[in-house]
C-alpha cells in the first residue's frame, strides 16, 4: 500500500510503499525505534498497532526527553 510520510526531524516528505499494514510494520520497514517517535494521522497520535490505509498521510515526530 502507498502512504505519504512527513519526517519532522529532517523536514522531508516521502511516498512509501508499505509492505505491512500497521504503524509498527512501517517503523520496522524504516528502521525507526518506536520508542523515539510519535506517529500522527489527521492531527491525532496513533499507536503502533493501528492499521494503516491506502494513501494515508502520516507525520513522524521525534520524541525529545531531557533531565
Locate the predicted segments by residue.
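Ubiquitin-like/PB1-type beta-grasp interaction modules and other compact soluble beta-rich domains
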Residues: 1-65
Amino acid at each position: 500500500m502507498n502512504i505519504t510520510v512527513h519526517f519532522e526531524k529532517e523536514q522531508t516528505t516521502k511516498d512509501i510503499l508499505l509492505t505491512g499494514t500497521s504503524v509498527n510494520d512501517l517503523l520496522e520497514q524504516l528502521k525507526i525505534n518506536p520508542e523515539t517517535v510519535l506517529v500522527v494521522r489527521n492531527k491525532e497520535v496513533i499507536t503502533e498497532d493501528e492499521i494503516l490505509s491506502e494513501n494515508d498521510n502520516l507525520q513522524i515526530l521525534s520524541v525529545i526527553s531531557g533531565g
